[in-house]
Amino acid sequence: GLPVFFIPLVLNSVLFISLFEVKGFAKNVFGSLAALLAVDSVLDPAAVSLGIWNYSGGFFYGVPLSNFAGWILSGTVSILVLKSALDTGRLSERLENTDYFLDDMVSFVFLWGVVNLYYMNIIPVIVAVLFGAALYRNDRFNLAISELDMV
């Protein structure tokens, strides 16, 4: 099950970095990997807190360094394969023209950010808020509170 969920996280990280028009293949890969590690720094502490993941000790809210090393290795390979397989020009155009293209990342940030907040995992909460702010700044949060009918 986990490899199936890994692919959308990698894709979302690549798309997220595309919002910032990072120039250069190496910078784009590095930025995508940094985004993926940041996503993992939100996901794994929450999963450990909920008992979904269980490690025998870990320095970051119960998550061991070896987990992040695994993400670096598998993430680098996955990002390179994905960037080689996709037409990044068309992907960037699609991202620009499709408001909901990163909606699952918005949901991810909200869900896992709230779980981390509940368990007082402060650093993951800050990372989730930063993701949320970046997504909001790039018009990826389509929450029209002013249009809601409040009774």
Name the predicted role of every residue range.
Residues 1-151:
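Aromatic-rich, lipid-facing transmembrane alpha helices and their immediate juxtamembrane interface loops
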